[in-house]
């Protein structure tokens, strides 16, 4: 059975909701899933899972959330060769740097040797029905990428 680790940063609750939607999607795919908040998680924990996911918001003018900075820096030092990763998160399309932290984390994962299992998912504010469908498809694609490599 495949395993997945979802680490999230959430200020308004939108990204925690995204993490919960992904958790349910993976459970429905018979994936053993663990979810934790970013400030309570060490980046090295990703080594223990097959599929590694970050869910984050973007703060201010395209900045990482304060509580995610240490994790972000530590992540880039990890060796996650052979692992599958995916990034998702919320933002506000009002801003020029819409959900930029999602892309920043995807770039950080690429430095670890992990394989991007699905394109990033960016959600405008809170997830709505079409976003839930996109997140379910995201989870399926991550699992399909994992299965194709194992």
Description of each model-found segment:
Residues 9-13:
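Short polar catalytic/cofactor-binding loops
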Residues 41-42, 60:
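Short, catalytically relevant binding-site loops at active-site mouths
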Residues 31-41:
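A short beta-strand-loop structural module common to alpha/beta enzyme folds
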Residues 4, 8:
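Local sequence-structure signature of Cys/Sec-based thiol-disulfide redox active-site neighborhoods
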């Amino acid at each position: 059975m495949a395993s997945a680790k979802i680490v999230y940063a959430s200020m308004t609750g939108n990204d925690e909701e995204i993490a919960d939607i992904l958790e349910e999607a993976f459970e429905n795919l018979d994936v053993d899933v663990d979810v934790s908040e970013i400030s309570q998680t060490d980046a090295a924990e990703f080594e223990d899972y097959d599929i590694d996911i970050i869910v984050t918001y973007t703060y201010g003018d395209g900045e990482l959330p304060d509580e995610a900075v240490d994790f972000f820096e530590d992540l880039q030092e990890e060796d996650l060769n052979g692992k599958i990763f995916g990034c998702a998160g919320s933002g506000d399309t009002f801003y020029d740097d819409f959900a930029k932290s999602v892309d920043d984390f995807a770039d950080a994962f690429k430095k670890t040797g992990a394989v991007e299992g699905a394109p990033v998912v960016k959600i405008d504010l809170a997830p709505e029905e079409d976003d839930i469908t996109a997140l379910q498809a995201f989870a399926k694609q991550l699992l399909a990428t994992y299965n194709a490599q194992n």
